[in-house]
Swiss-Prot record:
A molecular function GO annotation: acylphosphatase activity
Keywords in alphabetical order: Hydrolase
Organism: Cupriavidus necator (strain ATCC 17699 / DSM 428 / KCTC 22496 / NCIMB 10442 / H16 / Stanier 337)
Taxonomic placement: Bacteria, Pseudomonadati, Pseudomonadota, Betaproteobacteria, Burkholderiales
Domain Acylphosphatase-like span(s) in chain numbering: 5-90
InterPro entries per the UniProt record, alphabetical: Acylphosphatase, Acylphosphatase-like_dom, Acylphosphatase-like_dom_sf, Acylphosphatase_CS
Similarity comment: Belongs to the acylphosphatase family.
Entry's EC annotation: 3.6.1.7
Record: active site: R20, N38
Protein name: Acylphosphatase
Source superkingdom: Bacteria
Name of the encoding gene: acyP
Main EC class the enzyme belongs to: hydrolase
Reaction it catalyzes: an acyl phosphate + H2O = a carboxylate + phosphate + H(+)
Length: 92
């Protein structure tokens, strides 16, 4: 199957609630490659590489997030790169 890379940005109460770690676990469960990081503007940014079906599943998870999160929006757009494994990146 053809793979794509998407950039997803979660808005709302998504920092300090375990969102990044839970998102990385969800991405691992979906066998996606890529990374996740906090941004100084209070969002969480994800670059994910996989099939459209896998990416749509991650987007659906991100729209809900872990129980303590309150997600108001998940922006989705094209991303760059191909990744093996999923990692944490430093905050920017």
């Amino acid at each position: 199957m053809k793979k794509e890379t998407w950039r997803l940005v979660a808005h709302g109460r998504v920092q300090g609630v375990g969102y990044r770690a839970a998102c990385a676990d969800a991405a691992d469960d979906l066998e996606l490659g890529g990374w996740v990081r906090n941004r100084l503007d209070g969002t969480v940014e994800v670059m994910a590489h996989g099939t459209v079906r896998q990416l749509e599943a991650l987007q659906a998870w991100m729209e809900q997030g872990p129980p303590a999160a309150q997600v108001t929006l998940v922006e989705v757009g094209p991303g760059e790169g191909e990744f093996a494994g999923f990692e944490f990146r430093p905050t920017i």
